[in-house]
Structure formats: C-alpha cells, structure tokens
Amino acid sequence: MTVDLSSLTADADSGDIEAQLQLAELYEIGFGIPMDHGQALYWYRKAANLGSAKAQAHLGRLFIKGEGVPEDYVEAIRWLQLAADQDDPSAQASLAWCYQKGMGTERNIKTAFEWYVRAAKLGHAGARYNLGYMYANGYGVDRDDRMAIEWYTKAAEQGHPKAQLNAGLMYVQGIGTTKNLEEGARWYLEAAKHGYAKAQYNLALVYAGGHGVQQNDKEAFRWQTEAAHHGYHRAQFNLGLLYMHGLGVEQDYAQAMKWFTLAAKQNYGKAFYQLGKMHAGGMGTDTNEIEAAKYFQMAAESGYAKAQYRLGRLYDKGQGVECDHALAADWYKKAARQGNTRAQYVLGVHYARGQGLENNLIKSCAWLLLSQEANDPLYREVLQKVTARMDDEQIHEAKKLAHNIQEEYGINLKVRVNQ
C-alpha cells in the first residue's frame, strides 16, 4: 500500500485529528512507511492534546507497557482518566485495571469495580469478563453467582476465551444457573477454538466422559493433544495416560514417557509418579528400581500424597533406596495428613509395632480409626486387635485425637469418631 505521507502530514500539521491518528498508527506499526516509535508518540500526543479520547487511551496503554516511552503508570493514569471521562470503554477498562492492581495510584477495588461497570455497559469484553470474575469471587463486591454467569456469558458471546471457559465451568457445575452440560461443552468448544489450552483440556475431559457430548476417545485424544502442545501440564499428563493405556490412540509407552516427562518439567507431581511407575514396571524402559525411587521421591516432594505413601513403602522394604523405617514413617505421616487411607492404616500399624517411631497405641488407634473411610475389612480387623490391647480411657483419648486430626487437616470427615 502506498501512503501519501506528505499530504497526510500536512493535514496532521493543520490540526486534523483523524490524520494525526492515522499517521501515529502508521508510524507505530511501520505500515507503508518505516517504523518510528518517536514519530508515533509525537502524533498520538498531538491528537491527545486536541482531546482525542482514542489517542489519550492509546497513550495511556503505551505508558503502561513502556512501548516507545519509559514505563510510567502515573502518566498512564493521567491519559486514561481523560479518555475514560469521555466514555472511551478501552480506557475505562485499563483505568479499572490500574486501580485493581494499585499501579500508578493507591489500590482501590471499589473504584476498579465502578470503572469496569462503566466499560462493560459500553460493551467492552474484557471489562465484562473482569466483572464476571469479581462477582464469582466476591472481589470488590458481594459474591453473586447469577451476576457472574450473566457477565461471563456477555463477554463469551463477544469471543472472550477466558469468559467462554468460565461460563462453561459454571454451566457444567450449575453455579449461578441451571446445570447444563451441553451448554458447558459448547462454551468449552468455543474457547478451545481460540487456542485456549485450559478449555481444550476441559473439552477433552468432556469427550472422555461423555458429559454433554457423545463419548468419543478420539476427540478426547485430539483436544488433549492440542492443549498439551500449548504447554498445559495437566493435558501433557493426561495425554501420557492416553498413550499409556491406548485410549483414542494406539498404546505407545515411548510417547507416554515423553509427555509425562514434559509435565514433570513443570513440577507436576502426578507426572513424576507415573514416570516412577513406568521405571518400576519396565514400561517402555528397562526395569530400574533406583530410577523409579528417584521419581517417586520427586513426586512426593511436590506434595502428591499417593507418591508419599509409595515412597514410604519403598523405604520400609529397602526397594531402590536404603531401608529406613523412620523415613518411611515420615512419608506416611505426610500422606496420612492429606487423607490417604492406606498411609493412615500403615502409620497406625507402625505406631502399634513401634516401627520407625515410638510405640503408641493411642496414636495407632487414632490413625486406624480414620483409615476406616476406606471401608476395608482388613483395616477393621487390625483396629480391633489394637483396641483389644487398650483400656476405655485410652480408647477415649484415641477417638479425641482422631477428631482433632480431622479438624486440623480437614480430612476423612465422613468417618464419625465418637468421643
């Protein structure tokens, strides 16, 4: 495209705001003329000083981003305020963001909310999404799920991917609206089409489970792959599972290990755990107990309760690591406090035997009581053997301790511990 720079510059020099804006935009993107941020800034300032809300809003955003100018939130707010007062919705939304984050001004959630409302009423999709978020989380306003879904849906209808995902979540869970799996899946799909990884991941789960759509392993695989290639760790992990079990794709342990490894690089505990299982079971690699133990250790250190229990078993047996009952007990405790019933059971047994920690029937009974959530006959049998060695006062203390553990860690709340 040929630009008549002389004519456009003459018009801009004469005070033609539209010419000034056009010239500023051309210099900013280098369209038809060499890119020149200095000239772009010069013409945006000219138009802004003549009262152009569009130029004022753009100047504000340039100062926020530090593009062509030093980053300066105070100056950004000055220009955004001028444009916002002229009902420029993009300026109002940006100004709201500054108040929300406390950038260039004191943080003021109430003022941020008010500016988002003004921008949203003028049709700004981002402001509508932020209003939905604020209502959904009681952020700067009383929580109101009905208002949240209303604003999310308005933004979603304008093609805002995050709003589409959140609207989908609310329809799937029936929050603020009647539960509607089909509508939830529809919004996941819209967001997924925009390349939004979390939506692609959710859509894959929808197809895998047949929730709101016809169950389809191939579609589940397709969308997990999309999300995984966008770097979403949960999708990378799930894609590994699909390859491992041959769901929607031929079983391929090498591909499973590849995707588990990528998820593990983002410190995803479940991925470390699966890598440990693959090395322990010789799936796609030689059986290697030492390597397996290393992965279980990493999974356990990331806080994954299942791995903490498994690592405890390895230390108990000296499998891939040196036998260490005290370390085993430490890992059982960590898993037990997260509600892992197997760890609770084994910890109870260890307290009864004094293996790796002190012999303590009260603590043994307390953990065995909590492990009853698993409804395992063996667990009940062991509990009976332990209580047979205790008097009524000790049993009362054990029940009291179990109740305190429930309250402190918020675990195994289905188990009724009668004090």
Predicted features along the sequence, with ranges:
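Start-of-helix register in tetratricopeptide repeats
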Residues: 18, 54, 90, 126, ...
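N-terminal segments that cap or nucleate solenoid repeat domains
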Residues: 1-31
